[in-house]
A protein has these predicted regions:
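Hinge/lid segment of periplasmic solute-binding proteins
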Residues: 91-108
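N-terminal secretory/targeting leader peptides
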Residues: 1-86, 104-287
Length: 287
């Protein structure tokens, strides 16, 4: 996976693997390793495409540097869709076919499954509350995907890092602030140890989802019934992940507030409006 072993995202990858292993009765077995065990998190697509790994678990935003159109899958306001709507577009509205074409363009030999609707993500973790757009200018801030372009245009100094590298960077002062994803991941990675202010609501990634990759040759070599099991395991995992997220994230938000003295603030409307304005400008330049 592209996640540290302690991250709930790695747990989601393990959940998917268990479903496949159980349903195939051992005929197909998936072993899940954490980020860095074989390749760095941002190297997943290349590693799976080349066959260094048979498969992997991550997000499309980590491949954004390959083709900016990959931002359509949840990195940005997503044109008014939430994550479930975007998954509907992916399965029934032509998104799956578009993604296959994009992977052909970048030369990736992979079978991609997009699944797992994520809730809207916080603006992130800061040393003090953010009250206006100007407060973010010049901040050394972590994000990924087309959000890099959006925040850069807003005057933020952006550094794209995988999840496992964020807290050490904040601890050493290489970052002033950062976003990752959700209460459980953020808590497990250690955000409350380096910052006590979390700003909720943002449009930078309000409709993101996960991606499960398989090497194209490995996938095509599977028996049809095994490919069908993968199809249904992905859909079952998508639902299970969304239910687990509601339960775990809400508990961790509450416990960070009551046990770790984290203060949560709503992101000001002026920042949210500016995100939408700047995102439209970024998209216009890239179109």
């Amino acid at each position: 996976s592209t996640w540290p072993a302690k991250d709930i995202f790695h747990e989601y990858a393990l959940d998917f693997a268990k479903k496949v292993n159980d349903m195939t009765g051992g005929e197909l077995r998936i072993e899940v390793l954490p980020a860095g065990a074989v390749v760095p998190a941002f190297g997943l697509l290349d590693a799976v495409s080349k066959g260094t790994l048979d498969g992997g678990h991550g997000v499309l935003a980590y491949h954004y540097g390959k083709n900016s159109a990959l931002a359509l899958w949840g990195s940005g306001p997503s044109f008014g869709m939430d994550a479930n709507m975007l998954l509907s577009w992916h399965k029934y509205g032509g998104g799956k076919e578009l993604l296959e074409e994009l992977y052909k363009i970048v030369g990736a030999n992979v079978k991609s499954y997009v699944y797992g609707p994520m809730p809207s993500q916080p603006l992130g973790w800061f040393k003090k509350p953010i009250t206006k757009t100007e407060d973010m200018k010049g901040l050394k801030y972590r994000t990924v995907g087309i959000s890099i372009d959006m925040f850069t245009a807003m005057g933020v100094s952006v550094n794209a890092l995988p999840g496992g590298e964020i807290i050490p960077a904040m601890d050493r002062g290489l970052l002033d602030a950062a976003e990752f994803n959700n209460a459980s991941s953020d808590r497990l990675l250690g955000f409350p140890d380096v910052a006590k202010v979390c700003m909720l609501q943002s449009f930078h990634q309000n409709a993101e989802q996960f991606e499960i990759l398989f090497n194209g040759s490995v996938y095509n070599g599977m028996a049809p019934k095994l490919r069908s099991i993968l199809d249904y395991a992905v859909e079952a995992s998508s639902a299970d992940m969304s239910w687990k997220a509601v339960d775990r994230y809400s508990k961790d938000y509450s416990e960070m507030q009551t046990k770790q003295n984290v203060k949560f603030y709503k992101t000001p409307d002026s920042i949210l409006r500016n995100q939408l304005k700047v995102f439209d400008e970024v998209v216009a330049k890239k179109s």
